[in-house]
A protein has these predicted regions:
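A generic structural motif
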Residues: 43-49, 153
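N-terminal beta-loop-helix "entrance" segment that forms/cooperates
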Residues: 53-69, 168-173
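Helix-loop-strand module that forms the ligand-binding subsite of alpha/beta enzymes
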Residues: 67-151
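N-terminal beta1-alpha1 ligand-phosphate binding loop
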Residues: 16-45
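Glycine-rich phosphate/pyrophosphate-binding loop and the adjoining helix
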Residues: 15, 19, 150, 154-192
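Cysteine-centered motifs
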Residues: 5-6
Length: 192
């Protein structure tokens, strides 16, 4: 009788890369907490990266070329990701200004003034979620879906909106109900 031994090698390069984009700058952001919970749910089934776009300049065609270093870094991160997952609050029924600035940069052609070529977000799968007031970021997510679709991103139909209970605003702690956690798990499965 002979014994055959084999070794299984897991190649992490075949694992999907999901780029988290946090739409809040707040240190104790509920949306960062939501992203952290999503990261826990996904575990080792995908590679998670978080986009740092805090140094992105305001979009201005006067500084668009040569491409600013921060813009090149952000575009590269977007291009390398298999999917994007936005976690964002709602400001005045819409998305935060710094998130809009990021999306404006992503809508610009990578090749200067060549509007016939795809942008770095064309065809990119995008999931939308947010934690906020009683509207559960519905206005923000609807406007983001419209904008991202216009930008030719592939926006997932399933979204997640969390209406924070009043006490969360004084504790700065995001607590999910069983139903909300199940919805987050379902969205994570569709992103992976």
């Amino acid at each position: 009788m002979s014994l055959i031994c084999c070794r299984i090698v897991i190649n992490n390069s075949s694992m999907n890369t999901i780029l988290f984009i946090i739409g809040s700058l707040r240190a104790k952001s509920f949306n960062r907490q939501l992203a952290d919970k999503a990261r826990e749910i996904i575990g080792g089934r995908a590679q998670i990266k978080e986009l740092d776009y805090s140094d992105l300049p305001l979009l201005n065609q006067d500084v668009e070329q040569p491409e600013p270093v921060a813009v090149a870094r952000v575009r590269k991160a977007i291009q390398e990701a298999d999917a994007l997952w936005l976690f964002t609050p709602e400001y005045n029924g819409s998305y935060p200004g710094h998130l809009k600035n990021l999306l404006d940069w992503l809508s610009r052609p990578v090749k200067p003034m060549d509007y016939g070529t795809p942008t770095c977000i064309n065809g990119k799968r995008v999931a939308l979620s947010g934690a906020g007031g009683k509207a559960a970021t519905a206005g923000c997510r609807a406007k983001l879906a419209e904008l991202l679709t216009f930008m030719k991103a592939d926006v997932l139909p399933q979204q997640l909106g969390i209406a924070l209970p009043p006490e969360a605003w004084s504790t700065d702690v995001l607590t999910l109900t069983d139903e909300q956690l199940a919805q987050l798990k379902a969205l994570a499965e569709s992103v992976i």
